[in-house]
A protein has these predicted regions:
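Bacterial Sec-dependent N-terminal signal peptides
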Residues: 1-26
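Second-shell loop/turn segments in exported
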Residues: 34-42, 56-66, 103, 122, ...
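A conserved hydrophobic secondary-structure block that centers on an alpha-helix together
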Residues: 139-203
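Short helix-loop-beta-strand segments that form the rim/entrance of peptidase-like active sites
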Residues: 49, 311-337
Length: 387
């Protein structure tokens, strides 16, 4: 079974378990109901066509872009076409553009010239022309923090911290390096650095650089920040290791820049509950993506998982007792303004959320769910397993 469909099915089964745990009549018919869910998804599914349109016809959809607005309009129209009550929830989002120039070269005092594969980090300032500086390598963010200003001043800092391959849960390995991407530029700038480069966050050694969000500390000079692909990071490390006395210079050119915040929207769709309409089960993913790809896994697949689950419920004329709300969040990648604004709105309106489910770990084969909550909440969730 293909993975996008199978995750939607898993989501639906879990989704309906939340409701059927309170509904004896539905428990009796749950086996047939779940079988009907599978039949609808496997024989008349819309998931892959919807994902194709989002990724191929709209494409990359970084917040503030024309494509992000196109995705919002597409999302609302899709929800309407599947029978949901829809609305747009206005938010203010960062507007950053990569620009058209992005180049990285390494030069050594022994005459080696190497073109590097890299990307500006989201939110970075540009280089204002060509930036040149001697490169200094640190094996970790902690090593950079311990460095003296005399070591760093006037140089471009390279933090070559790899993700921990021993972690079975790869998100833990990613989380261990997340501060590296977010904070290294300002830490380096505080010590007098003129630029910051990191090893891309990824476990494989490959030629594909990964962008991601970074943030500047107030009151600290803003210096250009970029990520180099892991394969090139290994090459740079080799130069330092094999010839520690040679000077290594990095040449950077980036014309990325930030603009004033833009108006954007979360997209909401609902199936009103028949009995507990004021108690809400929210399901969602994030509609935005980075600008260098199509956002198929992050988080196009999550958007489609949730959209397809709601489509199937409507197609089966399912009437929930609780209100089911589908949310396409905007601006998860570089600010999380969609999630934060939604949470504030829910609190101000004193809404009661019975449960919230998110899909944002790619479109691979589903392995289960993670849960954040109290011990009592986790115990209650585990009690649903037999259903």
């Amino acid at each position: 079974m293909n993975t996008t469909k199978s995750f939607s099915l898993l989501l639906l089964v879990f989704f309906c378990s939340l409701v059927s745990a309170q509904d004896k009549e539905m428990k009796t018919n749950s086996a047939k109901f779940i079988r009907d869910i599978y039949t609808e998804a496997l024989t008349r599914g819309h998931a892959y066509e919807d994902l194709r349109f989002l990724c191929k016809e709209i494409g990359a959809r970084i917040t503030g872009s024309t494509e992000a607005q196109m995705a919002i309009e597409w999302g609302q129209e899709k929800m309407k076409s599947y029978g949901l009550e829809t609305r747009l929830h206005e938010i203010q989002v960062p507007h950053w553009e990569r620009g058209t120039k992005e180049a990285f070269y390494l030069k050594t005092s022994r005459g080696t010239h190497l073109k590097l594969r890299g990307l500006a980090l989201g939110g970075s300032v540009g280089t204002n022309g060509t930036l040149r500086g001697n490169l200094i390598e640190f094996e970790s963010l902690e090593a950079l923090k311990e460095a003296t200003p005399e070591m760093v001043k006037g140089k471009i800092v390279f933090v070559n911290q790899a993700m921990d391959a021993k972690q079975i849960q790869t998100f833990k390995a990613y989380g261990g390096c997340y501060p590296l991407r977010g904070n290294s530029a300002s830490i380096a700038a505080e010590k007098g650095a003129i630029g910051s480069v990191i090893r891309s966050l990824g476990l494989a050694s490959d030629p594909h650089p990964h962008t991601g969000s970074m943030y500047y500390t107030d009151g600290v000079d803003k210096i250009p920040a970029a990520a180099i692909c892991t394969a090139d990071a290994d090459k740079i490390h080799g130069f330092f290791k094999n010839n520690p006395q040679q000077e290594i210079q990095l040449v950077m050119e980036m014309d990325c820049r930030s603009f004033p915040d833009a108006t954007s929207y979360n997209v909401l769709g609902e199936i009103k509950g028949s009995k507990y309409s004021d108690e809400i089960i929210t399901v969602g993913g994030h509609l935005d993506s980075w600008d260098t790809g199509e956002g198929a896994h992050d988080d196009g697949a999550g958007i489609i998982h949730c959209l397809e689950a709601f489509r199937i419920l409507k197609e089966m004329n399912y009437q929930p007792q609780h209100t089911l709300r589908l949310v396409f969040f905007m601006n998860e990648e570089n600010g999380n303004k969609g999630g934060k604004t939604y949470a504030k709105w829910v609190k101000e309106n004193e809404e009661k959320h019975f449960a919230a489910i998110e899909s944002d770990r790619g479109g691979f084969a589903p392995r289960g769910f993670t849960c954040d909550g109290s011990e009592e909440q986790v115990e209650w969730l585990n009690s649903l397993a037999p259903i």
